[in-house]
Amino acid sequence: MSRLFGTDGVRGLANGLLTAELALSLAQAAAVVLGHDQLAEGKRPRAVIARDPRASGEFIGAAVEAGLASAGVDVYDAGVLPTPAAAYLIASLDADFGVMISASHNPAADNGIKFFARGGQKLADDAEDAIEAQLKVKPHRPTGVGVGRIQRFSDAEDRYILHLLTTLPHRLDGLTVVLDCAHGAASGCSPQVFKDAGAKVIVIGAEPDGLNINDGVGSTHLGPLQEAVVANGADLGIAHDGDADRCLAVDHEGNVIDGDQIMAILALALKADGKLKDNVLVATVMSNLGLKIALREAGISIRETAVGDRYVLEAMRQGGFNLGGEQSGHVIFADHATTGDGVLTGLQLAAQVARTRRSLQQLATAMTKLPQLMINVKGVDKTRAQTDEGVREAVARAEQELGQTGRVLLRPSGTEALVRVMVEAGDMATATRICEDLAEVIEKRLALAV
């Protein structure tokens, strides 16, 4: 059987790959692996569970709760909450582990199960492997007083909101903010916390019905937010995805502010306050070169990682850094959160607008994005992308031409016979020409036999 765990837990079509039976079995296996220390002492481990509002979350969540309780785990059901809220509650309650039922930015038909370790930390690969291995072992099934209890956690959202408010460096009084909640998990808490922080709030995409999550709204569909910001004369707009672990923004003229620009604004603010640990930002190789150039001029260095927030988190933990993220809008404030938090990020960004009395558009000029083009070259031997002599020579020529004003990145797909070619340059014409030339070389040199 292929590995169940992907880059962000177990995810797939609800009632297709992700059945109630699998959810129950995964929960029983996780109870043994993540609750081992408590079970070994004859105690009941404690776990927090939350979900986004997609319809399938109810039966999958019920199956997970049944699996946990039947394996001797006391369950605290936090209901519909963002993924980062679940992580926060796991840490604040000192629970042994937690579970989030969500497929993030995926369509409503999909769902997922993501486990967190003690402290609200993402699971290491070896812990996921151990859970998969435990699926093949007879479940731990206590009886009598050994079975777990299930409790509804009535003030979970309030606790999360209070936590977010304590992180604010400045209130939002006088700001008008449009929030697009993607008909997702932040539909309740995000508008409330922005109001509590003093902003005038206009809300779209906050009427979840179980089937409309991410449907034409949210961080993957920014059109409605752009229109609402301009139509209402708002200062800025904030877009979440289905589980609110990411944030993209829109300035007062409707221009998109991506994760790189958000990180630039926040890194500079933290450095100015003397709060950016070691003056380092952690970002992935996909972040725009303009981010590195702007921060280097400000005395901030970037630690690059592979693509994926788990790699950003790993580098942050290893180096003790407190700010990192991705161009997609996953931004991690290690001083306040253990994972990407879209509501927290939106609050911090809005606070800088209020604090500096500069528009988001003005703040975003902190970095100049280099024109960037990506081409997916399909049907090629991706394993040779870094070793083929002809490809290496073509890349070297491109890098020599670009010099310090651009870069080339080849990324083999993890799941397909495909190589992604990304080029940044001082102008789009140059980026396009070089990217197309490299794609042609890769297609010719690495083509798979038909």
From Swiss-Prot:
What does the record give as the active site?
A: S104
Q: Per the entry, which co-factors are needed?
A: Mg(2+)
How is the protein modified post-translationally, according to the record?
A: Activated by phosphorylation.
Q: How is the cofactor bound?
A: Binds 1 Mg(2+) ion per subunit.
Would you tell me the Gene Ontology cellular component terms? cytosol
One annotated GO biological process: peptidoglycan biosynthetic process
Enzyme nomenclature, EC number? 5.4.2.10
Q: Where does the chain bind Mg(2+)?
A: S104, D241, D243, D245
The reaction(s) annotated as catalysed by this protein in its Swiss-Prot or TrEMBL entry are:
alpha-D-glucosamine 1-phosphate = D-glucosamine 6-phosphate
Can you tell which superkingdom this protein's organism belongs to?
A: Bacteria
- What GO molecular function annotation could you give as one example from this UniProt entry? magnesium ion binding
Query: Would the keyword Isomerase turn up in this protein's UniProt record?
Result: yes
Q: Which InterPro entries match?
A: A-D-PHexomutase_a/b/a-I, A-D-PHexomutase_a/b/a-I/II/III, A-D-PHexomutase_a/b/a-II, A-D-PHexomutase_a/b/a-III, A-D-PHexomutase_C, A-D-PHexomutase_C_sf, A-D-PHexomutase_CS, Alpha-D-phosphohexomutase_SF
Modification sites for Phosphoserine:
S104
Q: Which Pfam families match?
A: PGM_PMM_I (PF02878), PGM_PMM_II (PF02879), PGM_PMM_III (PF02880), PGM_PMM_IV (PF00408)
List UniProt keywords, sorted A-Z. Isomerase, Magnesium, Metal-binding, Phosphoprotein
Q: What does this protein do?
A: Catalyzes the conversion of glucosamine-6-phosphate to glucosamine-1-phosphate.
Supply the PANTHER family for this chain.
PHOSPHOGLUCOMUTASE (ALPHA-D-GLUCOSE-1,6-BISPHOSPHATE-DEPENDENT), PHOSPHOHEXOSE MUTASE
Q: Which family does it belong to?
A: Belongs to the phosphohexose mutase family.
- The identity of this protein, by name, is Phosphoglucosamine mutase
